[in-house]
């Protein structure tokens, strides 16, 4: 499963399930919100949630008054479900951008992003060229002083998710990927308990572009 087309089909199939049946479902994205609150963003700040799936994070951000939110995912099935839910619950037209972060044709056109949020996306990119493309994309779209929030499986985390192999990370690996232009603001480890009761150790990081 190493072609973009196959991966789209894989994720589309996953998101045909109910959200609560997904191994990464969070009813309360508290760890992500903890880092977002550290940023002290303006309510019209440009927030890009990559690999959003059908996340409830966007509901929470809307509830906090943020108005400029962009959702990205490889799966249009996920984005359609997310967009329809947000429209129905909040009468808000969510900007959804289907795109492959390792070979971007749309996200790369965005500029001056104030906050990049990635929970559990980067660790699916196994090839060095995919990882380099991901980090280059971040550098290209981020505003100066913009924040990058990355939460991925830590080195002692699971080796697979949703049937796919993972590249697990520590802080040094993430810093190396982002480069010296990004300063670490905060990091912590967090063990997420998924809907099936399994432990999933994560490393959460927040960087700022200098």
What are the residue ranges of the model-derived segments?
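Conserved acidic residues
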Residues: 114
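A conserved beta-strand element that flanks and buttresses the S-adenosyl-L-methionine
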Residues: 117
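Class I (Rossmann-like) S-adenosyl-L-methionine-dependent methyltransferase catalytic domain
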Residues: 1-111, 125-141, 146-210
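Short catalytic micro-motifs in class I SAM-dependent methyltransferases
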Residues: 120-124
